[in-house]
Amino acid sequence: MAYNYNQGYGGYDAEDPEVKGFDFSDQSIRRGFIRKVYSILMVQLAITMGFIALLCYEPKTKAFVHNTPSLFIVALVVMIVAMITLACCGEVRRKAPINYVMLFIFTIAEGFLLGVSASTYKQDAVLMAVGITTAVCLALTLFAFQTKYDFTMMGGVLLVAVIILLVFGIVAMFVHNKIVQLVYASLGALIFSIYLVYDTQLMMGGKHKYSISPEEYVFAALNLYLDIVNIFMYILAIIGHARD
């Protein structure tokens, strides 16, 4: 199988004759793959929303977590290790049940970190961000399924955009200006919105030039999850800075 890692781990060129027998030409395989990915994604989002709700609406828990910074550090280390393992170790992310275990560990750690971050904002801002993120992600998903434009060829452009965003973010840390912060958050929300369309089309396969392998269901769910939580955090940042 000729994997095209320039387009993401586990991706391949759908026009490569070596993979024609293993692509998504079988509708039942494609539908089953998509159902599995979205089922995993829903569980991840439910866990994450649980942490956000707990840390935003339970004062004692919020106070304990904010007074115990070591919990945040441990969760951050666990999240990074789990994410690197899933991204770089193909045998781990393709083999059940270890792939589910690693994804669960990652989701718990990431959910906790997001809950801590969200708890620094006002409750109504968090609720507004959840609502806007839900609407945006549903609209983008429908767009990804319906549009004739193939976003799977934008992997290189999106990678450059993320690098620019990272550099911009470092600069924004030292420039305490409301406009700069709003521009940074808006750019982040835009980039990860495009990434959501890109990752959705990779999962869909079919007529798109690049697809993610059917055995990469955990990796596909991880990609979509990261897109959604990044969109949420950037939208939350936009709301927070707009109210300052």
Task: Label each region the model flagged.
Residues 1-244:
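A hydrophobic alpha-helical transmembrane-helix feature that marks the membrane cores
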